Design a protein with these regions (language model features):
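A residue-level marker of the well-folded mature domains of exported/periplasmic proteins
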Residues: 1-195
Length: 195
């Protein structure tokens, strides 16, 4: 039963690694069209698209990011069809804010590249996979459970970041240019440091 002190919200600054994934995507496009398969036009998703696009533009100012809305968090058919529509328009990189691997599978079948989401999904479309903004909820859950069992949990709002490890970037594909990998590492450290 909620009593005002035993309830809290936890979420993360996923826009931080999304920016970095945009840098990788910007380096990988030859057509300068990147398709972004997104669930719903809500602040979390729009924030991620904006961060991704800024990362793309840091590396490749000529590249464009075009969004297709699916109106679902998980529907592999809709996600795959949406990715295919972008590929048919000439996109050679597909990014996503979805929960299945369908966009990546379509990208791989077309010989395109893919920025996944949620976890390292490289095993699902290894030839297409570039990287992914990822979550690591384990330490946060352990912290909250530890506080709750010790009777010290105070609730409140937790807004995790790359600095505390709640969000991060999956390993970058080995064929991404070393200068881009170095630029991403430098920008990541700046984000963590707040500089």
């Amino acid at each position: 039963k909620a009593n005002g002190t035993n309830f809290g919200n936890s979420f993360g600054r996923m826009y931080e690694p999304r920016y970095l994934s945009g840098m990788v995507a910007g380096s990988a496009t030859s057509s300068n069209l990147i398709g972004y398969v997104a669930a719903f036009p809500i602040p979390e998703v729009i924030r991620g698209i904006n961060a991704f696009t800024l990362g793309v533009r840091e590396i490749n100012p000529a590249a464009q990011v075009e969004v297709v809305w699916t109106s679902t968090w998980f529907d592999p058919v809709v996600e795959g069809d949406s990715a295919q529509a972008m590929l048919d328009k000439g996109a050679d990189v597909i990014a996503m804010h979805q929960d299945s691997t369908a966009a990546g599978e379509k990208a791989e079948a077309a010989g395109a590249r893919w920025v996944a989401y949620n976890s390292d999904m490289s095993a699902h479309a290894p030839a297409a996979h570039l990287t992914a903004p990822v979550w690591d909820w384990g330490p946060r859950y352990a912290e909250v459970i530890g506080q709750a069992t010790a009777g010290t949990y105070e609730g409140g709002y937790y807004w995790g970041s790359m600095a505390d490890g709640l969000v991060d970037l999956a390993p970058i594909a080995s064929d991404v240019d070393a200068s881009v990998v170095a630029a991403v590492a430098e920008r990541k450290q700046q984000i963590i440091d707040g500089s």
